[in-house]
Amino acid sequence: MPTPLAAPPPDRAPSAPAAPPPAPDLAVVKERQRGAWSSGDYAVVGTTLQIVGETLCEALDLRAGSRVLDVAAGNGNATLAAARRWCDVTSTDYVESLLDRGRERAAAERLDVAFQVADVEALPFDDGAFDAVLSTFGAMFTADQERAAAEMWRVCRPGGRIGLANWTPSGFVGQVFRTIGAHVPPPPGLRSPALWGTPERLAELFPHAASIAAPTRSFVFRYRSPAHWLDIFRAWYGPMLKAFAALPEDGRAALERDLLALIDRFNVARDGTMVVPSEYLEVVLAKP
């Protein structure tokens, strides 16, 4: 006969469910993010991603004369790609030093682009002001994801399109985020930017889209060696620079080891160089 289960002692109350983590102070998070993106020089890294802006503009089938807004534009990869297609482009970011790099690049190519400091979570434009709204690896880093998505949707005209390039959680860059977060945890309750690289999250952020096309693409990081990639990102990529600066010496060494191990897992080169494909979603949303 099976032994009956013993009843819990009468004086032992059932365990209370764990309290949810407190909501992060998004204003504080945003200011920290602004400080991170203002440090280093993102353009050193960002210009290597130019091809992503070009292919996104092709996916959107941009036409000459279209009113195009690039949000969280950084050093202007999508901005320049749209301007090269003779679109009427407005390039925005909340970090003016990043826009300065975009201005320099546009001037070098004699491209006519309007640059304006603006936060994607509070865009200073009228409803439906643009035919297309773009962001390559930019809007995904906003503190308030729902508000950023709502603002992009608002300023896009009916019948217009929103184009995004977002790193996936399982790809190389998504795993870089995860590795850094294991050493320098983000504020409790803050959503990962890599969620923008999932169809499920896109459907949540843009519930009224007439269609969402989000094929998986791959950008290939090519560097002299894994150590070369780490040196470049550690010196110039603001979020990584800040992460290393926040750690003691042994913590910095541990993060370096983990990042190099991650590169080794993704690296397809066997000649000492670094050739690492990184998945991202190339997103085209249609607004009815």
PLM features: what roles do these ranges have?
Residues 132-145:
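A short SAM/SAH-binding and catalytic strip from SAM-dependent methyltransferases
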Residues 2-27:
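N-terminal auxiliary segments of SAM/dcSAM-dependent transferases
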Residues 67-122, 147:
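Class I SAM-dependent methyltransferase SAM/SAH-binding core
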Residues 146-147, 153, 157-226, 244, ...:
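Conserved catalytic/acceptor-binding region of the Class I
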Residues 121-132:
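A short acidic, Gly/Pro-enriched loop at the edge of an enzyme's catalytic core
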Residues 20-63, 77, 101, 108, ...:
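Conserved class I S-adenosyl-L-methionine
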Residues 194-288:
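Conserved Class I S-adenosyl-L-methionine
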